[in-house]
């Protein structure tokens, strides 16, 4: 027997009655705030390109503060930052800046206390300060009051001295701000000997540090800080390749510590490679192959292949299959998306990336939701996705594989003359999925059809996702209407995501229905948005 419900009954506790007595998915100001923190917009559309943030983008945030919920807002900012829910970092930093200069004292204090937790690296701190400057424009009062000076001082003083030395030498400046600016403007009083040394180094330079500490007896911890700062200075002044390699190896210096001329040396790259994080390794494979650092059949290639296929390392680095797929397709092409760099792909590395891609599926945590993916199989899906080197058809195939391998109860269908089941199995390889999809006769991408088909076939789904290029047709029934009809008939509070991967902009999601989302383009941030939306976190 079919489950039927009418809109005068709630589908779950999150629905509320409207003025006509029908139950709807209300988008509360807290929901709008969460969307903003995740992807920089309070509406139902995620754009992959950067948008300039202003107070007009954060009206719900301002209303929540006015309603006396500012401390809850700050807690939400901390949660999104600490749990890695944000697809982009800027919105959380902007929201914190807004909270830090609102008129509500408690919100302000909570925001400043949160600065060390939300601004985890110097780049975040510089961005936060710049947002505060932007928000102060046109206002007569200055921004460097006691509260900001204390928050910035605390940011530095709560750090371990050696870790701070690493941070200030790696991330020197951003957005027009430097550590020297912040230390001067915050009137910092360093909390211990090691931090005093780092502050002197930033403010006065290495010669002053040498002079001040040459005859002082130092604690073992402060001695380490001195030696580390000396290493970062020596590496900038020497042309001796062996000395540079020794300094990299002994003090674990990174690429940012080196001069551009140093990066022309194969041996220096080999030294950097030893401790290079996996994400940086994926980014630099082309460069290192082009410069013969990764020469065919070399020990470096063997080491890279071993690391790429090590499940423990993949898990520790939280590498998503999509990140590996982008690296694989970029590397195979022998050139980047932009720039003049060219290389001949090493077959062993291609094979290792391919293995890593399939291994990484095991590391994705299932959501436990029932998915129905509807795929556009038209020839135009061979176009490049906005923000990626991948074609739309490859992204759609990879997402089908991801859902098939991680979610137990899932269905794949294709837009043909009618909705057709897409025969994708757990053990299929990527090229096999792409071939299966291309074998299906294409039809119009009517975004209402997946819900109408699921309703007709009595298919239970919590999440509908449409993957298309930029064809987002609305024909006899609007997708929002089809989704509401599906919810009503099946008694399931289903959600719809329309992902138009080559589109600059479209509008299908009802902005007042928190169960609908549009995605323009596709990038790694879109994965965070989809997951958060699926788990009801935004």
From Swiss-Prot:
Residues the entry annotates as binding a divalent metal cation: 378, 380, 445
Annotated compartments: Cytoplasm
Listed GO MF terms: metal ion binding; misfolded RNA binding; RNA binding
RNA-binding: annotated span: 120-284
Keywords: Cilium biogenesis/degradation, Cytoplasm, Metal-binding, Ribonucleoprotein, RNA-binding
InterPro entries on file: TROVE2 (IPR040322), TROVE_dom (IPR008858), TROVE_dom_sf (IPR037214), vWA_Ro60 (IPR056800), vWFA_dom_sf (IPR036465)
Positions of the TROVE domain: 16-369
Location of region: VWFA-like domain: 361-538
GO biological process, one term: cell projection organization
Main location: cytoplasm
GO cellular component: cytoplasm; ribonucleoprotein complex
UniProt domain comment: The horseshoe-shaped TROVE domain is built with 7 helical HEAT-like repeats, and is closed by the VWFA-like domain giving rise to a ring-shaped monomer. Single-stranded RNA is bound in the positively charged central cavity. The MIDAS-like motif in the VWFA-like domain binds divalent metal cations.
Similarity comment: Belongs to the Ro 60 kDa family.
PANTHER family named among the record's database cross-references: 60 KDA RIBONUCLEOPROTEIN SSA/RO (PTHR14202), RNA-BINDING PROTEIN RO60 (PTHR14202:SF0)
Reported function: RNA-binding protein that binds to misfolded non-coding RNAs, pre-5S rRNA, and several small cytoplasmic RNA molecules known as Y RNAs. May play roles in cilia formation and/or maintenance.
Record-given protein name: RNA-binding protein RO60
């Amino acid at each position: 027997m079919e489950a039927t419900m009418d809109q005068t009954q709630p589908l779950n506790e999150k629905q509320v009655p409207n003025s006509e007595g029908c139950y709807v998915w209300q988008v509360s100001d807290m929901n709008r705030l969460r969307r903003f923190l995740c992807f920089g917009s309070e509406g139902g559309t995620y754009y992959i390109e950067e948008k300039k943030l202003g107070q007009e983008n954060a009206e719900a945030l301002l209303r929540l503060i006015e309603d006396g919920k500012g401390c809850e807002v700050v807690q939400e900012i901390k949660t999104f930052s600490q749990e890695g829910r944000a697809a982009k970092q800027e919105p959380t930093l902007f929201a914190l800046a807004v909270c830090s200069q609102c008129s509500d004292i408690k919100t302000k204090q909570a925001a400043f206390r949160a600065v060390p937790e939300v601004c985890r690296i110097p780049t975040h701190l510089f961005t936060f300060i710049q947002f505060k400057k932007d928000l102060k424009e046109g206002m007569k009062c200055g921004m460097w009051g006691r509260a900001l000076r204390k928050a910035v001082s605390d940011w530095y003083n709560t750090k371990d001295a050696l870790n701070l030395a690493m941070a200030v030498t790696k991330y020197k400046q951003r957005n027009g701000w430097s550590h020297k600016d912040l230390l001067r403007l915050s009137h910092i009083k360093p909390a211990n000997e090691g931090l005093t040394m780092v502050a002197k180094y930033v403010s006065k330079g290495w010669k002053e540090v040498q002079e001040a500490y040459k005859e002082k007896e130092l604690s073992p911890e402060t001695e380490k800080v001195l030696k580390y700062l000396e290493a970062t200075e020596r590496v900038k002044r020497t042309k001796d390749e062996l000395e540079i390699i020794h300094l990299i190896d002994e003090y674990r210096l990174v690429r940012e510590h080196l001069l551009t001329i140093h990066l022309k040396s194969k041996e220096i790259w080999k030294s950097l490679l030893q401790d290079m994080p996996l994400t940086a390794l994926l980014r630099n494979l082309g460069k290192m192959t082009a410069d013969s650092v990764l020469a065919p059949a070399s020990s470096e290639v063997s080491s890279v292949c071993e690391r790429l296929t090590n499940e423990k390392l993949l898990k520790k680095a939280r590498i998503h299959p999509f990140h590996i797929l982008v690296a694989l397709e970029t590397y195979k092409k022998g050139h980047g998306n932009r720039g003049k760099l060219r290389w001949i792909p090493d077959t062993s590395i291609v094979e290792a990336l391919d293995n890593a891609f399939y291994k990484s599926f095991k590391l994705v945590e299932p959501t436990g939701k029932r998915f129905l993916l509807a795929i556009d199989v038209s020839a135009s899906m061979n176009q490049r996705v906005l923000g990626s080197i991948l074609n739309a058809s490859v992204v759609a195939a990879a997402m089908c594989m991801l859902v098939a391998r991680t979610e137990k109860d899932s269905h794949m269908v294709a837009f043909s003359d009618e909705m057709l089941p897409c025969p994708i199995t757990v053990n299929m390889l990527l090229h096999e999925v792409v071939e299966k999809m291309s074998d299906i006769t294409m039809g119009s991408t009517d975004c209402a059809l997946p819900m109408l088909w699921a309703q007709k076939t009595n298919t239970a789904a919590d999440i509908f996702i449409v993957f298309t290029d930029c064809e987002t047709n609305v024909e006899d029934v609007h997708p929002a209407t089809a989704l509401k009809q599906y919810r009503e008939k099946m008694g399931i509070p289903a959600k719809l995501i329309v992902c138009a991967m080559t589109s600059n902009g479209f509008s299908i999601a009802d902005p007042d229905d928190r169960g609908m989302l549009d995605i323009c383009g596709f990038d790694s941030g879109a994965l965070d948005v989809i997951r958060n939306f699926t788990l009801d976190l935004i």
